[in-house]
Amino acid sequence: HHASQRCVPRWDFAFYKGYMDYDKQPINVDEQVALLQNRGLVIEDIAIAKLQLRNISYFRIASYLRYMEEDRQFHHYKLGSTFEQAIDLYLFDKELRQLIFKAIQDIEISLRTKMIQIFSMEHGAFWFMDASLFKNADFYEGCLDNIKKEVSRSNEDFIKEHSEKYTFPSLPPVWKTLEVISFGTLSKLFCLFKDNRLKKQVAREFGLPQYTYLESWIRCITVLRNCCAHHARIWNRRFALKPQLPNRLPLSWIAPTQKPIKLYHQLCTLLYMEQTITPCMDLKSSLLRLFADYPNIDLHAMGFPQGWENEPLWR
């Protein structure tokens, strides 16, 4: 909140936010179908639509239908909009999440490996426990607490065996510990680490000239990863956290374009990093195949610019 908002008394704030009692009642699948039809949606096969509504919640499907609305207030659909188009979008989004999640997995494992190798050679096996190597003591303290929690929750045999055998230091060495912490914790650890020379070394292994780009990208990847893990809609999502985009990079890249609020730029960061991990560029070929399988998807709504397929990164 801005300071001006923070001191608003409670009753006044209710007036600002438009607090109302929520009075919508739950409705069954037959009523859901009728409601969609009343709003102008064409349903080609009612039996299949009902089956889908029993397995995918109405609210989840509605988030794909929003894209077809003519007016947001009454939720009337544009002429010719069909339930099947929404299901297509839903299935496209689901496959897209799976591809992205798989690519992020490779980046995540690679980042862990580089942090273990590069930071340990200089700062030893327990560098992540040395507060003098980190900036912002409070944030670091919180990060270390998370590491302790995540290690104690881990069911990995190598963690259990380690704690049965050794009592000091209180955590296993970095090559064990970093394998079980979350990507969010890993990226915080990287961002809080003080030795910028080593961070630059890690960034360069990903083809990035400055560590600040890597920090920005892994923060965005953490958010994207969580969206995928929680099955959130991502195809036309607007991301609050935007990746820093260099104009030029040593490997295949894109021309500087509009503001990076949509998925396109997030995909570009994944593709760029993938070039340094798997030379066969799995994600790119899978994405191009997916776009061919769903030719009706509006790539512009995902932030894809005119002529994107001619960019060096996508060729």
Name each model-derived stretch.
Residues H2-R315:
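Long, contiguous internal "core" modules enriched in hydrophobic/ aromatic residues
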